[in-house]
């Protein structure tokens, strides 16, 4: 019947590995290009890696693409990535291990442009984000007992941001600011 047309052969034979892997290291991410194995039933290529904060990530690319983009890296350093070819029977190849060394996440560049200005009942902030990455600015204020209280969270992907934190007492206060990205990478903290 017609249903036979849609049945596929299930096997237990692992596909071959990808080959000729090329690494393009960028800010907070890596693009890998490779030669796909000659497999009739190739489903996808999957990359597995562990971020600096211990989070395990997995990214996949279809059998019709010879590249995969890996995101979420914080500080630039060496990481190991395992690439697997996966067939339509969900058999995995042996891992093809690649060493990558992405540059620091763009949040660190944004952090270095942060400027603070006193404002009545608050503080004005200015920063530059030329790559228009999604960033989160966290702002804290020191309480009278010496503890730090979170007072504001600002989400932005603007190339140039001018923001203000208002509604605070019009008296001198100590502030602290940091940036994080959507992968929970954090910059150092700037104290004012």
Residue map of PLM features:
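Surface-exposed, proline-enriched loop/turn segments that connect beta strands in immunoglobulin-like
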Residues: 17-21, 111-113
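Proline/serine/threonine-rich low-complexity linkers at boundaries of modular beta-sandwich domains
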Residues: 7-16, 98-107
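Conserved aromatic anchor
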Residues: 28-40, 121-133
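Low-complexity, Pro/Ser/Thr- and charge-rich linker/hinge segments at domain boundaries
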Residues: 103-120, 192
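Short, small-residue-biased leader/transition segments that mark boundaries at the very start
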Residues: 2-6
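Beta-strand-rich modules
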Residues: 1, 70-96, 161-191
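Solenoidal tandem-repeat scaffolds enriched in leucines and small polar residues
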Residues: 123, 130-181, 185-191
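Recognizes extended acidic, P/S/T-rich segments that occur
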Residues: 42-76, 140-170
